Amino acid sequence: MAEHVEGPLYYETMGRTGPVVAFVHPNPMDQSCWMFQMAQLSTWFRCIAIDIPGYGRSPKATKGLTMRDIAQACWEAIDDAFPGESAILAGCSTGSAIAPHMYHLRPDKTKALVLCGTGYNPRKEFAHHRIKSYQDRGVDFRWDYTFQDFSPAFRTTPLGHYFANLFAERNVYADADSIIYQFEALLQPEAADHHSAIKAPTIILSGSEDGAHQSAFALKDRIPGCEMRVLGGAGHACQIEQPGLFNRWMLEFLGKHGLMPASPKPMM
């Protein structure tokens, strides 16, 4: 079992045939932020969306949590659902930070990386601000924080409020200390070759209205052969705001690298 995690992570699956795609969510959301991807990609793939420690319905973390611990716990969830299987790893924000650690744990089991809401920010100043917000407000901060993951236009929509309410309704299961430990883990230094040693096919899908968008180009340059597409008008959680385009580009990328089942043909 992964260290500093008080039990197996909660996950949900969709799809019964095809390669495995594992989705890892951003802060402050949970696995349901991938509902649009799970619904469509389950036509071709066995999908698993995982709640990381302290979010959704996963157990708490303890002090000393590392990114490697979270990555190990995510692989254990995949092993529980699909024993012995390789996986395509998809992450948003925090999930995109976890995915490379998952790759380094099992490079032979990682078929590809699909990253969004991400960039290269070695100083990670944002983490200190998030820690203070959770210390001051606890899990109630999650509702306001959800809107920061959206573009200004999407924040005012009924769907934006739907997602904010969806995640906040699960605050009874969330744990502020665990979320703080996750940000502390994120602040730990990475190996010099953390990105340059990635050999799996990788794509960054970046929203033009994401605060991390400009730093996504720097991350692209650090990962060998990394591809990138920009979703115009989308924010940090671009997979929620523009699921049709996000899914299309994800499927095109997987097809390009021989990871897409031959039938049925996607409606591109």
Regions found by a protein language model. Give the residues of each.
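Conserved HGGG/HGGXW glycine-rich cap/lid loop of the alpha/beta-hydrolase fold
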Residues: 7-59
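Conserved alpha/beta-hydrolase "acid-adjacent" motif
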Residues: 211-217
